[in-house]
Amino acid sequence: MERSVTAGKWLAYCRLMRIDKPIGSLLLLWPTLWALWLAGGGAPAPWTLFVFVAGVFLMRAAGCVINDYADRHFDGHVKRTASRPLPSGEVSEQSAKILFVVLVLLAFGLVLTLNKMTIWLSVAGLVLAWVYPFMKRVSHLPQFVLGAAFGWSIPMAYAAVSESLPATCWMMFLAYICWTVAYDTQYAMVDRDDDLKIGVKSTAILFGRFDNIIIGLLQFSMLALLLALGNITGLGIPYTISLLVAAGMFIYQQILTAGRERDACFKAFHNNKYAGMAIFIGVLFGL
């Protein structure tokens, strides 16, 4: 009995960190890998790669914990999130705060092995990660803050590999923000009806009936920025092909979300992990 209770508690912590749902980690991992390879013109040092991959999973977990803590009084009123560990009472608020601190300290401990520029940038990244969940209370644009928070691994990667932040770094960062706003709007479309009832703000609500048009414009902007970046850095035909593959996936997503059905919007959101992977393959073979 005691063992089963303990096992249940651990499973609740895993669910709080979304270990059972790696989609968010993948959406953060792929652009981090784009940046690591492009910053150095090839594979980064093994330790640098380890720090960033581990950091992605740790900070994504920390982000999920602080997000659920911020939403603890709202999630119980939303069909998709009512069974999460905090609103269901499986994990206490105090335990969630402790877990967040532990995850952040582990990630920061890894960053301390890198150069000073990367360490200072990580502090700004932590602030962005902390601010994002609370933006849903005051602004319809929390997805832009999420894009900056998730995309902050890009300047950190450039700093770690080359100790510089060239224009191409910020082009990639801006492209990633466009992509994040697009895919997280798809995600927000799933909860739009519930969010309207409880007063949570999102780009899905702000964009209204123009949601798919604006998502398409954001996806186009992302691809245009990445194409320009590829031309500047001399990436070859494989990279261009990868962008065409990603464009095909974005068209598929538009077809899925045309009816604005919950399951279809969620499927479109998940499809983005393949777009990110395709672009990374293009970077690998284009260098």
Curated annotation (Swiss-Prot):
Reactions catalysed according to its record: all-trans-octaprenyl diphosphate + 4-hydroxybenzoate = 4-hydroxy-3-(all-trans-octaprenyl)benzoate + diphosphate
Keywords: Cell inner membrane, Cell membrane, Magnesium, Membrane, Transferase, Transmembrane, Transmembrane helix, Ubiquinone biosynthesis
EC numbers: 2.5.1.39
Enzyme class, broadest EC rank: transferase
Entry keyword Amino-acid biosynthesis: no
Main location: membrane
One example GO MF annotation: 4-hydroxybenzoate polyprenyltransferase activity
Keyword Cell membrane: yes
Domain of life: Bacteria
Membrane topology: Multi-pass membrane protein
Gene Ontology biological process: ubiquinone biosynthetic process
Cell compartments where the protein resides: Cell inner membrane
Entries under InterPro entries matching the protein: HB_polyprenyltransferase-like, Prenyltransferase, UbiA_prenyltransferase, UbiA_prenylTrfase_CS, UbiA_sf
Cofactor: Mg(2+)
Cited NCBIfam families: ubiA_proteo
Function: Catalyzes the prenylation of para-hydroxybenzoate (PHB) with an all-trans polyprenyl group. Mediates the second step in the final reaction sequence of ubiquinone-8 (UQ-8) biosynthesis, which is the condensation of the polyisoprenoid side chain with PHB, generating the first membrane-bound Q intermediate 3-octaprenyl-4-hydroxybenzoate.
Record-stated family: Belongs to the UbiA prenyltransferase family.
Protein's name according to its UniProt entry: 4-hydroxybenzoate octaprenyltransferase
